[in-house]
């Protein structure tokens, strides 16, 4: 099975300026992510960036780079530009790996590609089982619901499903359902679908929840969810995250 990994690497970050270039154990963060994608067995790994400093750094460690606009509203829009510019075939499997995930396990990068390859859908993703009630009620931990065939029913920052008879007590609410899933923000797409996705108008649901994947569900597309073989560690969003990752990789 062939698949291409595209790593969006945006220069501007309100909390961590120049984030993809920040040093971790002697390498820029983006290089760690690129190496993980290479280890996953991808046929091709492309770094998509909007800044010449990231382009130069990535080329220096041997990466293929595609320069993109700095006006995109989402990572998916950046993917679509890469697919168009690089003339990637519509049936190619594209895996979107975030540029701030230096600890992403290579096994889940290949897993999400294999998940899409097996399913007759245009989009696939992964989830893990929720393990604490704190995660359940944390809006930054996105919850996922799937049907008996693993097809997504909904994604939300709210605690879903709602345990009606137990919800007054958070502990009981967590115990009442063993079906709580936390979504992992890694996706595989058919390349042609990415172009279709960005052609659709944004929807009220995705804007309300601030979850891009809800656009696909709104327009009637199916998303297959599989349990991840390995739970990834948290990506780098803050200075505290950066210091923790530096300690891990020291």
Swiss-Prot record:
Keyword annotations from UniProtKB, A to Z: Cytoplasm, Lipopolysaccharide biosynthesis, Nucleotidyltransferase, Transferase
InterPro entries given in the database record: Cytidylyl_trans, KdsB, Nucleotide-diphossugar_trans
Top-rank lineage group of the source organism: Bacteria
GO molecular function: 3-deoxy-manno-octulosonate cytidylyltransferase activity
SUPFAM superfamilies: Nucleotide-diphospho-sugar transferases
Reactions catalysed: 3-deoxy-alpha-D-manno-oct-2-ulosonate + CTP = CMP-3-deoxy-beta-D-manno-octulosonate + diphosphate
Coiled coil: none
UniProt-listed Pfam families: CTP_transf_3 (PF02348)
Compartments where found: Cytoplasm
Segments passing through the bilayer: none
Keyword Amino-acid biosynthesis: no
Signal peptide: none
BP-aspect Gene Ontology terms: CMP-keto-3-deoxy-D-manno-octulosonic acid biosynthetic process; lipopolysaccharide biosynthetic process
Broad class of the protein's primary localization: cytoplasm
CDD domains named among the record's database cross-references: CMP-KDO-Synthetase
Pathway: Nucleotide-sugar biosynthesis; CMP-3-deoxy-D-manno-octulosonate biosynthesis; CMP-3-deoxy-D-manno-octulosonate from 3-deoxy-D-manno-octulosonate and CTP: step 1/1; Bacterial outer membrane biogenesis; lipopolysaccharide biosynthesis
GO cellular component, one term: cytosol
Entry EC number(s): 2.7.7.38
Enzyme's top EC category: transferase
Protein's job: Activates KDO (a required 8-carbon sugar) for incorporation into bacterial lipopolysaccharide in Gram-negative bacteria.
HAMAP family linked: KdsB
Family: Belongs to the KdsB family.
Protein name per its UniProtKB record: 3-deoxy-manno-octulosonate cytidylyltransferase 1
Species in which this protein is naturally found: Actinobacillus pleuropneumoniae serotype 5b (strain L20)
Gene name per UniProt: kdsB1
């Amino acid at each position: 099975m062939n698949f291409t990994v595209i790593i969006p690497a945006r220069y501007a970050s309100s909390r961590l300026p120049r984030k993809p270039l920040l040093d971790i154990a002697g390498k820029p963060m983006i290089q760690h992510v690129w190496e993980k994608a290479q280890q996953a067995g991808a046929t091709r790994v492309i770094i998509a960036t909007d800044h010449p400093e990231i382009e130069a750094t990535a080329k220096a460690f041997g990466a293929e780079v595609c320069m993109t606009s700095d006006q995109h509203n989402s990572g998916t829009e950046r993917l679509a530009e890469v697919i168009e510019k690089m003339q990637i075939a519509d049936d190619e499997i594209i895996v979107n790996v975030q540029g701030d995930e230096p600890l992403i396990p290579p096994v889940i990068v290949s897993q999400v590609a294999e998940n899409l390859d097996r399913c007759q859908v245009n989009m696939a993703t992964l989830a893990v089982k929720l393990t604490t009630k704190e995660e359940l009620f944390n809006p930054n931990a996105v919850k996922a619901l799937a049907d008996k065939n693993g097809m997504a029913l909904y994604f939300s920052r709210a605690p879903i499903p709602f345990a009606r008879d137990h919800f007054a007590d958070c502990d009981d609410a967590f115990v009442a359902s063993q079906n709580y899933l936390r979504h992992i923000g890694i996706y595989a797409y058919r390349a042609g679908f990415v172009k279709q996705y960005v052609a659709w108008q944004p929807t009220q649901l995705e804007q309300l929840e601030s979850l891009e994947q809800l656009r696909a569900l709104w327009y009637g597309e199916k998303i297959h969810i599989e349990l991840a073989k390995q739970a990834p560690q948290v990506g780098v969003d803050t200075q505290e995250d950066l210091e923790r990752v530096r300690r891990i990789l020291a």
